[in-house]
Design a protein with these regions (language model features):
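Anion-binding and metal-coordination hotspots
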Residues: 1-344
Length: 344
């Protein structure tokens, strides 16, 4: 309505009165509704009023003459429809209620259509975008950066970062990453020369034998259980030991309580997972993992300069802003470098 009001050179309140949508005028919609939000009935009344107002605005826009039709007005109306579709459902009685849970690809910002919900872990939620930084362990410089929506897999950013590295004619020799990037194309399609340093996934330690008690023979593609029963395996598959053998096994109580027998999942890149797990058991391996602290420091520095709130709307503009902060970081690193200090 504000678009049409500006086009007519009217006040928003005048247009709202014509439409019958006075509730949208004022400092905020929530203030105009003025409900006790702890009361279920009042929340339902407020939702019904908002939906009725949206219907009135849709009808009013459709009745406007062609000369007054404006692309932006239709664009804003589509945003409202999207929010309604993802957050509101009708019960059997026909009453509108807010959907419990979060819709897939849920839009979280009216202004920025690319922002999404995401999770770093079960307890840590991220709203908006996630920044990614490629830190050069030798020079301390940031070689490339990336931005993804919060609900996108973090590993998906590596394709665009690789394109930036190609323009710099840079080849990766070592990857010091966290576990979110283990599914990236860098790891999946790595050459034998590329070393990957990452903490391995934790092995569940219950009352029964853990996966580490099973021996993997990579030459024969055979897995051997603690009772010396052998079964073939394939990366990415699940090995099911025969239930009859498990039922007769003297170690059954220590291995499984399932009447179907013991099963073991094999990671698609199980060889790498085993290598990472064995490496972090050694003092030298743990020291190599600690080298990644420099990456976390770089992320903290850039986060300090850029802030935790996106300055712009859209991934492209926020990527540009992240690159700006990476340049500032690199200038600080350069200013602390020995050649620069000697020249000074």
């Amino acid at each position: 309505m504000s678009v049409i009001a500006a086009q007519r050179e009217w006040e928003l309140a005048e247009v709202a009165q014509e439409v019958g949508a006075e509730v949208v005028c004022g400092s905020s919609l929530k203030a105009n509704l003025d409900r006790d939000w702890d009361q279920t009935t009042q929340k339902e009344e407020a939702l019904s009023l908002v939906l009725a107002t949206l219907t009135q605005v849709e009808s009013w826009l459709g009745s406007l003459p062609h000369a007054e039709q404006h692309p932006k007005a239709q664009q804003y109306l589509e945003v409202a429809r999207q929010v309604k579709a993802q957050d509101v459902e009708k019960e059997q009685e026909g009453k509108a209620t807010l959907i419990k849970g979060v819709a897939k690809e849920r839009r979280i910002s009216v202004e920025d259509g690319q922002m999404r919900h995401g999770r770093k872990s079960r307890s840590v939620r991220v709203d908006g975008d996630i920044r990614h930084v490629l830190h050069d362990m030798d020079s301390g410089m940031v070689r490339a950066v990336g931005v993804t929506a919060a609900n996108a897999p973090e590993a998906s950013v590596t394709e665009t970062i690789s394109a930036d590295l190609e323009r710099q004619a840079v080849t990766l020799q070592e990857l010091h990453i966290d576990r979110a990037y283990l599914s990236s194309h860098w790891v999946r399609t790595r050459s034998p020369e590329l070393e990957v340093y990452c903490k391995a996934w934790r092995v569940r330690q219950g009352k029964q034998f853990s996966k580490q008690e099973f021996h993997l023979d990579w030459e024969r593609q055979i897995i051997c259980c603690p009772a010396k029963l052998e079964m073939p395996f394939t990366p990415g598959g699940v090995v099911h030991f025969p239930k009859k053998s498990c039922a007769q096994c003297p170690l059954q109580a220590q291995c499984t309580t399932s009447p179907k027998g013991r099963s073991v999942s094999i990671h698609p890149d199980e060889a790498l997972v085993v290598e990472l797990r064995q490496r972090q058991l050694t003092q030298a391996g743990r020291a190599q993992l600690r080298e990644r602290v420099a990456v976390e420091h770089t992320l903290a520095h850039i986060g300090h300069w850029q802030g935790e709130r996106a300055r712009y709307r859209g991934l492209r503009k926020n990527l540009c802003d992240l690159r700006r902060c990476a340049v500032i970081h690199n200038l600080h690193v350069l200013a602390r470098s020995e050649p620069f200090l000697q020249a000074a």
